Amino acid sequence: MAETISPRYSRILLKLSGEALSGNKDMGIDAQVLDQMSLSIAHLVGLGVQVGIVVGGGNLYRGSQLQKDGLVGRVTGDQMGMLATVMNGLAMRDALVRRNIRTRLMSALPIGTVVESYSSRDAIRHLSQGEVCVFVAGTGNPFFTTDTAACLRGIEIEANLILKATKVDGVYNKDPSKYEDAVKYDHLTFDQVLDEKLGVMDLTAICLCRDHNVPLQVFDMNKSGALLSVVMGEKEGTRVTK
């Protein structure tokens, strides 16, 4: 009898940036990218992996320029960004439901009948019942990034691994799109990331993962099979641990 290969991680938190959802577009959601992401996530669900997702909003709203021009304040700009993540979350939820994946959309901000309010207890229950949970509106507070929200949600739902999906295949010592001699790291410690200012995630996010000993994996979501490889425990991207 053939040996059944089981996923290494039973519950994960996947961070999808808004830029990842835009594909090759400057702004907006690339339908093909969204469809491929939903397929990759559906594969994990089929293997019994419990999946939580945090989505960013940079593909729909970037507030830095408006703030620089003095048109909106920082708090308002961050709130606009939170609402952008809700739109991305709605798209991701429907893409998953279209594949017959039961999905919950949970917001850190109360938004009436559009999205249910986030509760870690409810999220864990939904995940345990095989539903995917898409978390939107960041932490619900200004001044915190969606990377920080991803690490916070990952800790709250007791995820075995936090995955950051990017457009590059891991962490490099410098920008590989600008420098041909950029070197990729296969493994890093959280302290290395902080000391070398590698820009994997912001300081708060990295410290959360380090202090709660939750490993982080950075990988290229656009690479076919990469998400599955990470969850199966295969070598893919860059792994960051304590």
From Swiss-Prot:
Query: Where on the tree of life does the source sit, at the highest rank?
Result: Bacteria
Gene behind this protein: pyrH
Q: What is its EC number?
A: 2.7.4.22
Where along the chain is UMP bound? G57, D78, T139, G140, N141, P142, F143, F144, T145, T146
Pathway recorded for this protein:
Pyrimidine metabolism; CTP biosynthesis via de novo pathway; UDP from UMP (UMPK route): step 1/1
- Cell location: Cytoplasm
Task: Report the GO molecular function annotations.
Answer: ATP binding; UMP kinase activity
The task this protein performs is described as: Catalyzes the reversible phosphorylation of UMP to UDP.
Q: Which organism is it from?
A: Acinetobacter baumannii (strain ATCC 17978 / DSM 105126 / CIP 53.77 / LMG 1025 / NCDC KC755 / 5377)
Location (main, coarse): cytoplasm
- State the PANTHER family in the record: URIDYLATE KINASE (PTHR42833), URIDYLATE KINASE PUMPKIN, CHLOROPLASTIC (PTHR42833:SF4)
Keyword annotations for this protein, in alphabetical order, are: ATP-binding, Cytoplasm, Kinase, Nucleotide-binding, Pyrimidine biosynthesis, Transferase
* Activity regulation annotation text: Inhibited by UTP.
Name this polypeptide is given:
Uridylate kinase
Reaction catalysed by this enzyme? UMP + ATP = UDP + ADP
Please name the top-level EC class of this enzyme: transferase
Protein family membership:
Belongs to the UMP kinase family.
- Signal peptide start-end: none
Mention any one GO cellular component term assigned to this protein in its UniProt record: cytosol
How does it associate, per the subunit comment?
Answer: Homohexamer.
Give the Gene3D superfamilies listed for this entry: Acetylglutamate kinase-like
